[in-house]
Amino acid sequence: MLHARAFKVSVVWTLLLLYLGSVVHATESSLACPDWPTCFGTMLPEMTGGVFWEHLHRLVAGGLVLMFMLATWLAYKETKARPWIFRASLFGMTLLIVQSVFGGLTVIYELPDLISTTHLSLALLFLALATLLASSTIVIADSYPARSGFRVRAWAMVLAGFVFVQSVLGGLVRHMDAGMACPDVPLCLGQILPPLVNAPITIHFFHRLLAILLAAAVLWFAHRVYWKETWLPIRRWAKIVAILVVLQVTLGFVSVLTLLAVIPVSLHTLLAACLLASLIHMATIFPRSSAATPGVLAPPTN
């Protein structure tokens, strides 16, 4: 079905957009185009320096809007038996437009912390919804054996929620310029518990603390799924999330050690988004009951 493919493309496109957004900030290109939606009064500025990254980010964002509009229209045409998919797509379209407006506001008001972090938060919420739609419209051929009783769906969604919170906290670290508030690794200012004397140190420290706790929880979850479940697709995704969370924490430390170099910082954002999407995918494809099969998540043949 074409709508299923369009949702998958939208997920990948959103991940690319999040990566580009991080590159824009890491290269200090966020205000390279001082106006919005144009750039120096034109839609075709000279693509050099920071303008290249900022305007490329805007062009990719515009492309995502068009791509998801197509996905929504295809969902309307092809999912008559599952109307919730079209309704969710409409909500996603609204969310995407609001997120784009917040992108403009970050430029107009010159990067206020709250608006910039809201811009990132809405992008992550859209990614979560797009992943839900993409995962709900796939066909999984593997038969599903008896389940272990471990609440995979519930745990995956809870952890996805915490990954979202941690990502928003990371956005605050970025937009408050708190990335080097703790300049050493793994300690902070040479201490396990640093003096929380200002907002940048406090935000950075709690971002690290939650990262360690969340990484431990995700690794525990992945271990339980891999060894308790026998369904191959869910075991494969358990390995993926375990790898992602280890790489994510590593990149967080590398970002500090390299003084917030563009590539590790941008990959740090990308992997957080990939981890969020992977957990939502696991929760969505996992059958609701032992009698269910993966086919319940497949699109109807209409």
Locate each region found by the language model.
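Polytopic transmembrane helical bundles with strong interfacial aromatic enrichment
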Residues: 1-302
